[in-house]
Amino acid sequence: LKIARGINGTADQMIYMVADPDAKTRPVIDFQGLCTGMTIGGDYWYFKGFDVTGSADGQKGLQVSGNHNTLDQIETYHNGNTGLQISRLNVTDTYAEWPSYNLILNCTSYGNADKGYEDADGFAAKLTVGDGNVFDGCIAHHNADDGWDLFAKSATGPIGVITIRNCVSFGNGTLSNGVHYANGDMNGFKLGGSGVGTPHVVLNCLSFNNGATGFT
């Protein structure tokens, strides 16, 4: 499921993909382990109130690659890699084209695991992320790798400043069935890597019962 680059709203007229507020159950986009998940390449979209699950092994559940998008009350779980990740759309994209100014609001990501139990985070904004991205009021728990992963490396250079506020990360490195896996990094909030520094902002966040470090 891909929203291609160029299918855009505007600041004054966003495009909405929103669940029926009167529905008795939440809509579920289930890829049943067969394919890649959902990719957002457009700008100025507003998503609210649905679940994304079942991406194939090694495939992210939901990838945000556009700009100025809002994801509100989205749940990503039991995907074959990271539940929700902000990263570039194409390998040829330059920093100016990396996803910027996206708001991830009141979202939850849990139970995401690749077969090697070493790469699937709850949330990630890593490697190829632009400026002004924000996570607010989100929860990551019981993912195989980290709760949040903001990894950067020298080959692609520093990423933009990420703001994480009012968020909770717990139980990562142990899946919800209680089985502990030691292959992943298992941090609550991983805020960099490879000696490539970015002054990310973390405000009013809580991390507990993760397999490794709460904040690193």
Language model features with spans:
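Extracellular beta-rich repeat passengers
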Residues: Q73, N166, H180, G193-T216
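Short glycine/acidic-rich loop motifs that flank beta-strands on beta-rich extracellular proteins
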Residues: K2, F31-I40, S55-V64, G80-I86, ...
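Extracellular/periplasmic catalytic domains that process cell-envelope and extracellular macromolecules
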Residues: N8-A11, P21, E97, T156-G157, ...
